[in-house]
Amino acid sequence: MLVTMPEARALGMTGRVEALLGQRLAGTIDRVSPNPDVRELAPMYSDFWRRYGQCEVVVALGGGSALDTAKLLMVAGEDDRFATLVDALDAGGDFRPSRTKRLITVPTTAGTGSEVTPWATLWDRHVKHKKYSLHLPETWPEAAIVDPQLTRSLPHAVTLQSGLDALSHALEAIWNVNANPISDTFAVTAARDMMRVLPQLMVSLDDEALRAQAALAALQAGMAFSNTKTALAHSISYDMTIRHGLPHGIACSFTLPAVMRLAIGRRADRDAVLAQVFDGDIGRAPDKLTAFLNGLGVATEFSAYGVSEPESSAMIAAALDGPRGRNFIGATA
């Protein structure tokens, strides 16, 4: 099965995969929309298991939403009902699939790192106004095909948002209670490279070498946070996306300087790793990061997004108490 987004057909990507697989391809689902929602996925899930229950492999082609959708589709309980999966996520309990598929990921953006992680994000914008994260041993990709050529058609806004998502993944893996030497290695390299490459890429969108460097940085950031999970900046971002409509890449990155200020001084070992990203200058790191974001046209104040000071304070307090917020090294301080 091929799971992808509608625009992949116009870009020639869907046809290319269909030609390569020929009769081995059971079918194509190309109705993936940004930020998969419970209401949209429920009928797609039922149709998938009814029509393609016997297929063995899912190929996910697209950005984070396509990869997330594939992971959500590929696991089923005894009753093949999407509601069973959603109820388990909502209750915070275990979902133990009785049937699964193998997954091959082919990212067309350089940001989510989903090609090398087991996580899939699911949104409920209509009933419970929540964000869920699926994370199962079965949803780890079996293989990832990272071809920077597939990212060259990305427009300016998506390139920016994807790159900032990757940067957030890298930094969130550093100020994280689950950090380890392996995640640190990936995170530092990813953060440094993305901060170097992204400003250049924004003025040279068709540069193949820059696209390749961004794709590698995003993959390395994915490897970093696949070890640690994300932390406070992502926890804050969920409300910003659900309630204020902010694209995820902006929502999870505009608070990075503020979160960094909260992180610095909490743990000497984390300060030392952060310093590696900013040429040893930990004291000026938040200001450098603010200047970097502002230079890309990203404001770093809640007020720029229509959020009042009381609302932002409440949002931060709630985020610190959330599952991702509790990964932050300053959450219990």
Where in the sequence are the language-model features?
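Glycine-rich phosphate/pyrophosphate-binding beta-alpha loops
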Residues: G111, L219-C252, G322-R326
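ATP/NTP phosphate-donor binding region
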Residues: M1-V57, F302-S303
